[in-house]
Amino acid sequence: MTGVQTCALPISVIALLAIAPLYGFAQEKVVPIKYGDMDQWIIRKVHESGVIGGNTKLLYEIGPTKEIDGNKPYKNMGGSPWGTSNVMAKVVGIVKTNNSVYRDKRDNGYCARLETHIESVKVLGMVNITVLAAGSIYLGDMLEPITGTKNAEKNMNWGVPFTQRPKAVRYDYKVKMSGEKDRIRLTGFSKKGQVAGQDCAITVFFLQKRMEDAEGNITAKRVGTMVMKYDKDSDGWVNGATYEVLYGDITKHPSYNHETMGLRERDYTRNSKGESVLIKEIGWAEANENPTHMILQFSSSHGGAFIGSPGNTLWVDNVKLVY
């Protein structure tokens, strides 16, 4: 393969989105993201190693209703485009889980509860790791098992193929803040540190036009952007919250925030060779360009891996795109 080509993966837009759109106002078309109603969940029963207690933990994944018993690496099922921060790790032969996304009851169905907490595993003479883990759901998948906290983000496949141009993202949410004025950093390899500034729950939506070169490196131009931070408790559920997607170069837009909306070089994807590579955003696309991929993440904390405030909680339900 020579030159530069647009990335292509065998997932169609039709498989990603629910087939029948919902119609709202006269000039508005609303399309649910597949499994975005959060009413179907896969429950994994993972048995942790005896040396750390031998407990059976339940890990929740978004997909067709099913139970899986056993320490099997998870792969997205039933055409689900959703990954979660719930993972099975195997470090120096010890099986340990992290569970920071939960299935919560809501009315006659379910929603997703994302929670920031501290996870630790300690075995004398073998392993001593304590990390801060945010609750996160996202479009993409995770390669299991995780074998350590160093470069664990390489296990994540960030985003899904997508070629449309929605005008907004819509979902229901509820927020509960930790009440802490600053965040903490716990990476598993160093002492607990303090990070200035209040923790926030966050929604990130990016549309990218990706290219892959002959060596498998992936670059991207940013086509569309929507980022929303939540720094206060909500008054119960906020239904049908709708946020506009901004197209093209948005650096002069009044709502632009470089920290959260700027071009990035920290997300990973799998190239056509199946290798995990960094996505390097190299510029802003023209405002009328079509994307090749969509990134959507909901997280109970912001600021990067292993940073946040324990207790921060974000509930999410009924995720849709508006055209």
Residue map of PLM features:
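Short, small-residue-biased leader/transition segments that mark boundaries at the very start
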Residues: T2-L9
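Extended, low-complexity, turn-rich repeat/linker tracts enriched in Gly/Pro/Ser/Thr and Asp/Glu
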Residues: V175-D182, G193-Q198, A305
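Aromatic (Trp/Tyr/Phe) and Gly/Pro-enriched flexible surface segments
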Residues: Q27-Q164, A196-G248, E259-V322
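Hydrophobic h-region of N-terminal signal peptides that target proteins for export
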Residues: L16-F25
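A short beta-strand element within beta-rich, extracytoplasmic domains
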Residues: R165-V175
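Short, solvent-exposed secondary-structure capping/transition elements
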Residues: S178-R185, D213-E215
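Substrate-binding/catalytic groove segments of enzymes
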Residues: K181, I250-H258
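Sec-dependent N-terminal signal peptides
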Residues: P10-L16
